[in-house]
Design a protein with these regions (language model features):
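Short, Lys/Arg-enriched N-terminal segments with co-localized hydrophobic residues
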Residues: 1-7
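Short, well-ordered loop/turn elements at secondary-structure boundaries
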Residues: 7-8, 137
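Core catalytic region of metal-dependent phosphoesterases/phosphodiesterases
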Residues: 9-15, 19-114
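Conserved beta-sheet core of the metallophosphoesterase superfamily
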Residues: 101-168
Length: 168
């Protein structure tokens, strides 16, 4: 008989989920619109977790470009919720991340992840740093977070903040 073939594992990238960060619902973008249009923090958490679970399979890899969550009881929340999300999770550390709390929930934690054609960072790399990388190796797309609703710098940058990827 014919053998079923396993789907290729995929890599997904997301950043700045800010799980449990109630105050982020008050933040406005540069046009004065709310950055995140959710009624409350539970609704925001649920939406992001549902979206994640709807596209990521257990064999997939998820690169999180930092700023995972806020608030108290981090480890309890991570254990009850984040740990159940599918995928092999890798973290590029963000400016709000506590490695001690997050380490048990990620396969690895890096300051950046360098892969063929891509460099994953939390904040966008300075253009001179990116130019330097291009001189020695093949050109890379800098996949980053941190800037939320703001546009990426000109050039080979891609923002994967949840606000810019439909929270998925």
């Amino acid at each position: 008989g014919t053998q079923g073939h396993k789907a290729m594992a995929k890599t997904f990238v997301i950043s700045d989920t800010h799980f449990n960060h109630a105050n982020i619902l008050e933040f406005k973008d540069y046009l004065g619109k709310p950055c995140r249009e959710f009624d409350n923090v539970d609704q925001m958490n649920e939406a992001m977790m549902d979206n994640w679970a709807s596209v990521v399979s257990p064999e997939d890899t998820v690169i999180h470009c930092g700023d995972v969550l806020f608030g108290m009881d981090k480890v309890d929340w991570l254990t009850a919720n984040f740990a159940k999300l599918p995928g092999k999770k890798r973290l590029v550390i963000g400016n709000h991340d506590n490695v001690k709390h997050l380490a048990p929930f990620f396969k690895d934690i890096q300051l950046w992840i360098d892969m063929p054609g891509f460099i994953f960072t939390h904040t966008p790399l300075h253009e001179s740093t990116l130019a330097e990388a291009h001189r020695f190796k093949e050109p890379k797309l800098n996949v980053h977070g941190h800037i939320h609703t703001n546009p990426s710098p000109e050039g080979p940058y891609k923002c994967v903040c949840v606000e810019q990827i439909n929270y998925t």
